[in-house]
Amino acid sequence: MHCPFCRHEDSRVVDSRSLDDGSAIRRRRQCQACGKRFTTMETTALTVVKRSGVAEPFDRSKVINGVRKACQGRPVTSDDLAMLAQEVEETVRATGNAEVDAHDVGLAILDPLRRLDQVAFLRFASVYRDFESLDDFEEAIAELRAGDGDDRGRPAVQPRLFTR
């Protein structure tokens, strides 16, 4: 890592801290030549490839905004959406691929959204899966009903203690 002050090539790490739920590392460095300190940020790159072929960095806020529309009028908080976006990012990163299709991001949204709010799940799935008839909705509802009670291996949802 080059020193931003004297451009010397050698620096030593003085301190490291994990940020953003472990997806980034902040390092405090000291130049071996001039002794000045500077901060660097390290993150692993995760790129989303859209249908058009355009590649862009993964952005949690896009996940939140897409799901927020499906959750309008539902008892879903901003914290719930932030946790869902974090889970989606963790799922996508767990594939080990530096590039993922936008379609795969959408698939990663479906299960956590189903657990969060079934009505929002139906709204999102109807657009994402391109529902064309009532039969498509009935099929999705049947999936939801079949999945009820089968929460093995899924994180528990903490009940709300206070309502707003």
From Swiss-Prot:
Ranges of residues in domain ATP-cone: 46-136
Domain of life: Bacteria
Cofactor(s) needed for function: Zn(2+)
Residue intervals of every unnamed zinc finger in the record: 3-34
One BP annotation, GO: negative regulation of DNA-templated transcription
Keywords linked to the UniProt accession: ATP-binding, DNA-binding, Metal-binding, Nucleotide-binding, Repressor, Transcription, Transcription regulation, Zinc, Zinc-finger
Signal peptide residue numbers: none
MF terms (GO), sorted A to Z: ATP binding; DNA binding; zinc ion binding
Cofactor note: Binds 1 zinc ion.
Task performed by this protein: Negatively regulates transcription of bacterial ribonucleotide reductase nrd genes and operons by binding to NrdR-boxes.
Recorded family membership: Belongs to the NrdR family.
NCBIfam families, sorted: transcriptional regulator NrdR
Protein name in UniProt: Transcriptional repressor NrdR
Species the sequence originates in: Micrococcus luteus (strain ATCC 4698 / DSM 20030 / JCM 1464 / CCM 169 / CCUG 5858 / IAM 1056 / NBRC 3333 / NCIMB 9278 / NCTC 2665 / VKM Ac-2230)
